[in-house]
Amino acid sequence: MTKLTTELLLKKGLPKCSHLKDLKKLNLSKMQLDLKDLDQKLFSQMVNLDELDISHNTLSDLPGNLRLHNLRILNFADNHVEDVTVLKQFPNLEEVIYEDNIYLTVSDNYKVFCLLPKLRRLNNKDITSLANHVRFVNHRELSNRVEAYWESKYKDKLPDKPPSQKINAVAKDFIKAVVDNVRYGPSSLKDFVRWKVEMIARNLIFSLSNDPKKDTDPVLQTSEDTAVENSSKKRESADECTEGSPTKRPRIQIDLQSMPLSPRKSSRLQNSPLCLTPTKRKQETSAQGTPSKFIETKSPKIALKTTPSKKHTNELSAKITGKPKLPLTPKKIHKALDNIEPLHFLQCHSKNNSCEDFKTQLWACAFEPNLDSSCPKAVATCGGDSICIIDCETGKVMKKYKVTGEEFFTLVWTTLTMIGKDGQKRKINVLAAGGKYGVVRMIHAKGSLCYGEIKAHKKAISIMCFSPKQETFLFTGSYDKRIILWDIGVPDCDYNFRPSQLLTLDTTSVPLRMCVVPSCPDEFLVAACEDGCFAWDIGLDKKQGRRSHEVEFNFPLYKEERKDKCFHIIDSLAFLNEDIIASKSVMQGSIYLWSWEKTLKSRKNKNVKKLDAVILSQMKWSSSETPYLVLSTSPERDCVFCGDEDGKIWIYDLDSCKADLQRGKLCSTVKEPTKILSWPLLCSQKEKTVDKTLINVVTVDPTMEYLVALTDINIVSIWKIQ
């Protein structure tokens, strides 16, 4: 036993200082401390303490009021602690270690998940995915069972407006009965389930005594099953999703064998503009027995037929100097947009690496988050059966990942904090990619490893996005007309991970684009679908694990619909800032800028399911009738980009009207594009001339150095913004 004093605590703590309030770390390990040695008066002075180590002592419990509200890391391993509920006094804990406390069980782990909302690591293991599953999915299920038990057994014992005395009389019997009768999960979690059920039951009784408005929504069930495979395991058969899986272009029911070289013709829309059923085809290769792998490749480049300017020639031969480019200021953007020149044209998704492949369609691209300023700017692209990661400056394909028989439609990056074998934290960029097989593949590109797969949907995945607030929260949209929220977890040092399904959102058609609302990332998701634009409540504290849309947005263009024109197909949507959304409909000929906040404020009550979008501005775009040409935004630079069917890239610099947009001022005139980039005349290695193409998607990096456009004819075009 050691007597703790101010002097001793200052000696054991860091940084070295003269006041307890300045301590950030404190190591009291192996000091034979008992419960009575932890003086609350001393500990309450360490208001800024971030990390506390009291491991290898003889503690039977922790004091209940240490007032260490900023504590993030707590280690009390190798003690005699029997109860973890005392940890709720540390709401900001992110990491806890309590190994070798022989009285603590797996049920205590689950209790800690519920008590500590910010906990990410327990006993040196990442638990984000499992903890979120317990906090949300298990909580929902147990809440539903407790409420169902109340409804069937005890509700009739109370009058409509029961007095508190009557509620208290029934409450004691109800709590005892529900704890004894509600079962969930394996027997090893029996103690946790009883504890959790009692908490839920007490909250239910409390809500009745406070007479809130009763929620009469039906209880909806959600599937919690998800299959995970690590890279060391053979991928299971995907026969259930190979036969009849939809193609990426579900515009019209049509025989795919009669398709021309470019599968999109405006006549396809004219034939049956309201038919939204996906086309189907038999896949050439089953997912079974088709291993995925990273491969080395030298991708064919396509040369400019016209001679570039001397300035451009210098750019093509320039090498990376490692000197970071100064970010563009808003005043320089317009000037920069006048100086965008082609840099590389690559055929890196060719079948068999053939330079004659002008049929493979490219669907999505995303710039890798910058973890190191010395690293080259890299962009991930997908199309056909492969994913490429390209150095924008050199045009070199640094990594290529291929899955025979797959057709990738979407990809998205996230940055995770991984713990290495040395115990050190390091940030890694992870790429999630999905497509025809309905499987999300988790790729650590720098490690040249696809470390796992999530069997997310039985039909093809059309779109994905990560939450900007929770880096492990992944939304996947599919041709099965569902959007599912996953917690993908963080891989350990051996790349083992455990994803969890948290929420299912039902859509009325295929989701094409989707975004978490930046101003409220825990509350709403907006998606552009084949029959309109919708928003869902994604709050995980709600009862329903499966939900329909909260609201549908109407656009002025809908009033002009007729038999040969369907404007409900919203094929593009992106946030320009925290409030303004850029979106367009098929055959619209323009792009809408509309306010999320003002639109939602027009909702008079929650029973209103349709809202007129508050349009702030309209921007002229191509009169193309070709669907699924995706726009993108640069929130950092207030710019919008969109390609068209002739290979042109439309660019809108909105800095000049930024103030009006932020004030919600309506612009009555249609805004012209700031610049239109024309497709250059290209010549392949076999002297094939490419004078125009269809641009599927355009994106720029956050610092506005590179613009990347993907085409329908297997060409990745990279442009340099000077």
Swiss-Prot record:
Gene Ontology CC annotations of this record: centrosome; chromosome, telomeric region; cytoplasm; kinetochore; nuclear origin of replication recognition complex; nucleus; pericentric heterochromatin
WD repeat coordinates: 456-496, 506-546, 565-604, 623-662, 690-722
Leader sequence segment: none
Cellular location(s): Nucleus; Chromosome, Centromere; Chromosome, Telomere; Cytoplasm, Cytoskeleton, Microtubule organizing center, Centrosome
SUPFAM superfamilies, sorted: L domain-like (SSF52058), WD40 repeat-like (SSF50978)
Top-level lineage group: Eukaryota
Family matches, as Gene3D superfamilies: Ribonuclease Inhibitor (3.80.10.10), YVTN repeat-like/Quinoprotein amine dehydrogenase (2.130.10.10)
LRR repeats: 22-42, 48-69, 70-91
InterPro entries according to UniProt: Leu-rich_rpt, LRR_dom_sf, LRR_LRWD1_dom, LRWD1, WD40/YVTN_repeat-like_dom_sf, WD40_repeat_CS, WD40_repeat_dom_sf, WD40_rpt
Xref: SMART domains: WD40
Residue numbers spanned by region Disordered: 211-292
Compositional bias of kind Polar residues: 219-230
PROSITE patterns: LRR (PS51450), WD_REPEATS_1 (PS00678), WD_REPEATS_2 (PS50082), WD_REPEATS_REGION (PS50294)
BP-aspect Gene Ontology terms: chromatin organization; DNA replication; establishment of protein localization to chromatin
Keywords: Centromere, Chromatin regulator, Chromosome, Cytoplasm, Cytoskeleton, DNA replication, Kinetochore, Leucine-rich repeat, Nucleus, Repeat, Telomere, WD repeat
One Pfam family of this chain: WD_LRWD1
Family, similarity comment: Belongs to the LRWD1 family.
Protein role: Required for G1/S transition. Recruits and stabilizes the origin recognition complex (ORC) onto chromatin during G1 to establish pre-replication complex (preRC) and to heterochromatic sites in post-replicated cells. Binds a combination of DNA and histone methylation repressive marks on heterochromatin. Required for silencing of major satellite repeats. May be important ORC2, ORC3 and ORC4 stability.
Domain writeup: The entire WD repeat region is required for the interaction with ORC complex components, as well as for association with chromatin and for binding to histone methylation marks.
Subunit annotation: Component of the ORC complex.
Protein name: Leucine-rich repeat and WD repeat-containing protein 1
Originating organism: Xenopus laevis
Taxon lineage: Eukaryota, Metazoa, Chordata, Craniata, Vertebrata
